[in-house]
Each structure stands twice: as C-alpha cells, then as structure tokens.
C-alpha cells in the first residue's frame, strides 16, 4: 500500500482557511496590476524617447532587474505582514491555547505558519509569470534567469518569514510584531552595510596616509553575506553583466586568491548562512511557544 503524504497540520489548516478568503485573490491581482503598470510606464518612456533619439531597445533589458527588484521588495513587505501576525494573531483570537493542547509540536506550529506564508509567495510567483515573460520577449532574458529569480524570492521569503514568526512569538500584538520584523530586517541591512563601508573608508584613509595602494576590504567583505539581499545583488549582477561580487572585489584591489575564490560562490555561501539563521529564528519561536505551553 502507498503511504499517504504527511502534511504539516498547521500548514494545511492555514491553506484551507486562506482558500476561503478573497483577500489573497485581491492581493495577487493588485500586485500583478502594479507590475503591469510598471511595464507600461517603461514602454511609454521608450516610445517617447524614440521621437528624439530613435528606439533604444537596449533600455528594455532593464525590465527584468526592475521587475525582479520590485518583486523582492513586495515579498519583503507581504511576508512580514503575514507571518508577524501568525502567533500573536492566535493569541488575540484566543485560539493559541486550543492549538497548544494538540499533539502538534511547537516547531511544527512555527514551520506551518511559515509554510502558509510561502504558499502565498509561490502563488504570487506563478501568477506573475505572464508579466515577467514580457522581459523575455522585449528584454532578451532566458528562462534560467526567471527560475533563478524565483529561487531568490523563495529564499528571501523563508528568511523574512522566519523573522516574522519569531517576532510574532515574542510580542502579543500583531501590529507591534510587524513593525519589529521590518525593523530587524532593515537593521541587518544597515548594520552590515555601515560596517563594511566604515572599514573600507578607514583602510583607504590609512593607505593614503602611508602612500600605498589600497588592496580592498579583505575578509571583512564577507560580513555582507549576513545581508539577506546580497545574494540577490550578486544574482542580478551576473544576469545583467555576467560578473558578480567577486569581480567587484577584484576591481577594488583585492589580491587574495582565497577571498576571490570564496566570493565566486557568494550566492550559495550567503544562502546557506542565512538559512541557518532562519532555522535559528524558527527554533527560538518554537521555544517561545513552548514557554507559553508550559505556563498553561
């Protein structure tokens, strides 16, 4: 006999509840409408410039990165809104106590809440394929680029979603949880960027004072691997220019073959690191839920 596929019960419940609501349909329609408007604006700008300088078809190549960055931004906003109210929302509806009486583990609860948010992301990605296909017709992008972008969106959704579930397990109000989730994400981006640029500025000033050539930030550049958006930047650079962050470090004067070799694998290295961080956030969320269960 064939074994039945086991599905996370929390994930299954969220899918059933979500399928009965029109909110997801309206949200997906709104997102795709926004993407279509962006495409129409870019085509209008190209047509207007054609009157003076002729059609600049090479400008349409930027359709893909612009749409891709917009999608990443939307995922960064939508997923926190969904996940930041996952646990705190159950508290507000006073249904968390009932959920904790079931044999479902607290980690399964956290993973199920994240999985339901990722289902929304996957639905959003699938419905955006017709809009993104315009970048293939006009911008000359390949299907591999689209698959890579979808992989980046899934990775970003998991990272941001795990932070949202953690924040939702810490605070009691969904609004506060949403703000805290966005604040943590923005804080990570700002801190890693500021540290890198501070090191670069300091090293560059010291090299100028000594009259020697600046040889790049060195291993400090790897702190940007903690930035969840750095793999997306590397991916876009490789799609558009054929080179990634490794080339950028080389142009900054980096001579170390080890640093350059590691930076060529920037995307997988950064994704693995951030997925480990995501798992830690989920474990912490499960621990916080366990504390709530033990108090009952």
Give residue ranges: language-model regions.
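Membrane-interface alpha-helices at helix entry/exit sites of multi-pass transporters
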Residues: 105-117
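Secretory targeting signals
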Residues: 65, 73, 116-172, 180
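Transmembrane helix boundary and interhelical loop/hinge segments in multi-pass membrane proteins
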Residues: 79-100, 113-114
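Transmembrane alpha-helical segments and their membrane-interface loop/helix boundaries
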Residues: 1-73, 160-169, 175-296
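Short, charged cytosolic
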Residues: 1-7, 91-99, 121, 150
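Well-ordered mid-protein domain cores that form the structural environment of catalytic cofactors
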Residues: 73-74, 81, 97-100, 105-108
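Long, hydrophobic alpha-helical segments
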Residues: 63-89
């Amino acid at each position: 006999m064939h074994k039945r596929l086991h599905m996370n019960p929390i994930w299954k419940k969220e899918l059933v509840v979500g399928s009965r609501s029109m909110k997801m349909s309206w949200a997906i329609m709104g997102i795709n409408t926004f993407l279509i408007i962006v495409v129409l604006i870019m085509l209008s700008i190209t047509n207007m410039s054609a009157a003076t300088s002729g059609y600049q078809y090479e400008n349409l190549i930027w359709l893909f990165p612009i749409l891709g960055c917009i999608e990443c931004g939307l995922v960064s906003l939508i997923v926190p809104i969904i996940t930041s109210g996952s646990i705190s929302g159950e508290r507000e509806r006073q249904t968390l106590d009932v959920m904790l009486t079931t044999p479902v583990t607290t980690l399964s609860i956290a993973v199920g809440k994240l999985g339901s948010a990722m289902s929304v992301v996957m639905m959003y990605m699938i419905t955006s394929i017709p809009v993104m296909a315009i970048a293939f017709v006009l911008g000359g992008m390949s299907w591999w680029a689209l698959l890579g972008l979808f992989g980046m969106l899934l990775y970003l959704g998991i990272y941001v979603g795990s932070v949202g579930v953690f924040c939702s397990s810490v605070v009691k109000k969904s609004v506060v949880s949403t703000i805290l989730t966005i604040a943590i994400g923005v804080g990570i981006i700002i801190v890693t960027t500021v540290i890198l640029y501070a090191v670069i500025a300091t090293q560059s000033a010291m090299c100028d004072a000594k009259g020697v050539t600046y040889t790049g930030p060195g291993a400090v550049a790897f702190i940007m691997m903690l930035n969840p958006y750095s793999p997306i930047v590397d991916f876009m650079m490789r799609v558009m220019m054929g080179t990634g962050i490794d080339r950028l470090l080389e142009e900054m004067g980096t001579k170390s073959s080890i640093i350059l070799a590691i930076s060529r694998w920037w995307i997988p290295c950064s994704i693995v690191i951030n997925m480990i961080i995501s798992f830690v956030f989920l474990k912490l969320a499960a621990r916080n839920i366990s504390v709530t269960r033990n108090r009952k």
